[in-house]
């Protein structure tokens, strides 16, 4: 995953134990119930450049999002659930790192947090209808707990 250089050295990879996802969903749902605010999109690790207006605010590190909004106890439970679910994770230091052939940093994303799972963070109840998100079980069973308390 990490054999390329510069702009082409772009990868996150995870191996997930799917049998652990129900416990993870329960832990994240409880964390969202404990949250006093919606995680700030500008404060959570994104995996798309904020300059990319087509895809920004869609791909966030799950654990970093939870840690930014939930109680410490709820975040610790999610961290344990992530550890149980993520068998392997790795990431390059940047996504689309600028280099001699790509001297701009418009799309460059520094990866500071990578728990192995990403999430979409709706900023309001209305965001649940964006791109069919409300049709996903994760949206209705887990993410909706940010707003339906």
Which residues make up each language-model segment?
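Terminal, contiguous helix-loop blocks that mediate binding/assembly
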Residues: 1-149
């Amino acid at each position: 995953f990490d054999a390329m250089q510069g702009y082409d050295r772009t990868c996150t990879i995870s191996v997930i134990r799917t049998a652990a996802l129900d416990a993870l969903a329960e832990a994240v749902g409880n964390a969202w119930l404990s949250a006093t605010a919606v995680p700030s999109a500008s404060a959570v690790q994104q995996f798309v450049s904020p300059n990319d207006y087509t895809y920004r605010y869609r791909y966030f590190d799950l654990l970093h999002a939870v840690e930014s909004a939930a109680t410490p106890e709820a975040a610790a439970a999610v961290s344990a659930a992530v550890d149980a679910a993520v068998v392997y994770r790795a990431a390059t230091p940047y996504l689309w790192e600028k280099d001699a052939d790509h001297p701009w940093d418009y799309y460059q994303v520094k990866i500071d947090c990578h728990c192995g799972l990403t999430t979409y963070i709706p900023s309001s109840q209305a965001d649940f209808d964006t791109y069919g998100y409300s049709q996903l079980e994760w949206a209705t069973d887990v993410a909706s707990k940010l707003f339906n308390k």
